[in-house]
Amino acid sequence: MGSFSIWHWLIVLLIVVMVFGTKKLKNMGSDLGSAVKGFKDGMKDGGQSAAATDDKPAAPAGQVTNAQASDKTTIDVEARQKS
């Protein structure tokens, strides 16, 4: 009694076909299929690109010196006065 029989599912399917129509259901099915295919392709491509980047060593980080850190065009916010 608690579960649905095959007849319940057939009636639900018939009502859905009557409401949406077969053409609309076909379009929704093909859109869903292409979305799933695109997702799978994206996951496959993501795994290959991640494996390719793991093989290369990272470039060494550059060291910042005082000459680079103090730029003449920067403005100290606290020293600036409102006009």
Curated annotation (Swiss-Prot):
Compositional bias of kind Basic and acidic residues: 73-83
UniProt keywords, alphabetically: Cell inner membrane, Cell membrane, Membrane, Protein transport, Translocation, Transmembrane, Transmembrane helix, Transport
Topological category with respect to the lipid bilayer: Single-pass membrane protein
Cytoplasm recorded as keyword: no
Origin: domain of life: Bacteria
Protein function: Part of the twin-arginine translocation (Tat) system that transports large folded proteins containing a characteristic twin-arginine motif in their signal peptide across membranes. TatA could form the protein-conducting channel of the Tat system.
Protein's recorded name: Sec-independent protein translocase protein TatA
